[in-house]
Amino acid sequence: MQELIKRTLPQDDALNQAIVNELRSQNWAGFLNYSQVQQLCHNFELTPLKLAMHLLPLAASYSHTAISHFNVGAIAIGEQGDFYFGANQEFANSAIQQTIHAEQSAISHAWLRNERRISDMVVNYTPCGHCRQFMNELHGAEKISIHLPHSQNNPLHSYLPDAFGPKDLDIAAHLLADENHDLIADHQDDLINQAILAANQSHCPYSNSPHGIAILFKNGDMVTGRYAENAAFNPSLPALQTALNFAYLNDKKLSDIERIVMAEKALKLSHKTMAETLLSTLTSVELEYYSL
């Protein structure tokens, strides 16, 4: 990742050098907190939006696009000014529906870093209908601004007029809000507990079928993923995708996976088979399934 980032941001530029130094200090995680953003903006006389635009090729470098070879980068800006990178993640030899779109990637990245509200989405290509619908699940969706290289400060709902969303199904819960499904993590195996805790934070008001993923890497690091459901159903993002996306955006290698656990309360639906199918194309490590 280090060399790819350096190729994306030519190092004969002082701003690019400063950005690379920040990323190096955090092991190439695709994230800049508010203080880092403010310092870069101050040192190089930029607005946060101009900095985000400059960072889009960098965000896109986290893509995995074995099918389309079309890299999309996105930056979700949290309400306190943190920058969460996102990139499209494709999976060859699996169903195309397993794909993670760049805006989904940035939002789920923010979610797993415990962001509670997105104020702006900066992206290098116009959001597709799938992503517009996914963003409409967010709290305050009507106030989110979309920024493109050729057009800034566009309300999300200008891309999604007469929008369908949670309120149409009498759902008050929104993606990124605090969630609690009363799932108890009291197993002797800590990785199973981490998967249960992730499931407990799932956003699944339509199926009430939470599930979570916990991945253990050979160096002892853990990554978790939560299920993000959508009022339109199909734009929903399974927990395996949110976990893999977080791993990619934090420079984890799938070849270093040691164990993967899914914890699921399968009331109306189950993601077990879908997860097993995707995993079989990525690793020889088998999914450990824990029913809640």
Swiss-Prot record:
Phylogenetic lineage: Bacteria, Pseudomonadati, Pseudomonadota, Gammaproteobacteria, Pasteurellales
Species name: Haemophilus influenzae (strain PittEE)
Protein name per UniProt: Cytidine deaminase
CC cofactor note: Binds 1 zinc ion.
Molecular function terms, GO-annotated: cytidine deaminase activity; identical protein binding; zinc ion binding
Domain CMP/dCMP-type deaminase: 47-167, 186-292
Subunit and partners: Homodimer.
Protein keywords: Hydrolase, Metal-binding, Zinc
Residues that bind substrate: N88, Q89, E90
GO annotations of cellular component type: cytosol
Entry-linked Pfam families: dCMP_cyt_deam_1 (PF00383), dCMP_cyt_deam_2 (PF08211)
Coiled coil is among the record's keywords: no
Described function: This enzyme scavenges exogenous and endogenous cytidine and 2'-deoxycytidine for UMP synthesis.
